[in-house]
Amino acid sequence: STAPLTPDGHINLSPKGLDCFKVLSSNRVAYMDLISSGNETSAHTLENGRITFMFCSFDEKPMILRLYGKGHTVLSSDKEWRELARPFKIYPSTRQIIVADISKVQSSCGFGVPKYEFSGDRDIHFEWAESKGAEGLEQYVEVNNLYSIDGLPSKIASVR
């Protein structure tokens, strides 16, 4: 989750799936971010860096784990990209990598989290991206990913 600094700004919760999260060191993590309908995480971390990751156990042993830190966006044009992209499978719809330096870790019981069984990843994003093609994806980013819903620029907007 991320949030802008203004008290009336919108808090962003962005659930993730796929094999997109990596632990880079004892206090650094990253996730590969795909093109989607907004770009709140990039805009918020560009403004203030604050980011929280939450993981929930949905099997027999309940637990919630939160990672608190300062994050930033890395684009394919950035010097960091080559090394950071190495552990990820990069897709045509990969938009950026969000990197966070973790300053605090917290766990809680998770007793209120229901049990669920994983049945598989969704293919719809990749089908959508393929139907758009490279040019269509670029146009989609231009229309939907330059600014947050509160009007904050994402890193993509800051380099255009």
Where are these regions (language model features)?
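Binding-site signature for planar aromatic cofactors or substrates
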Residues: 1-160
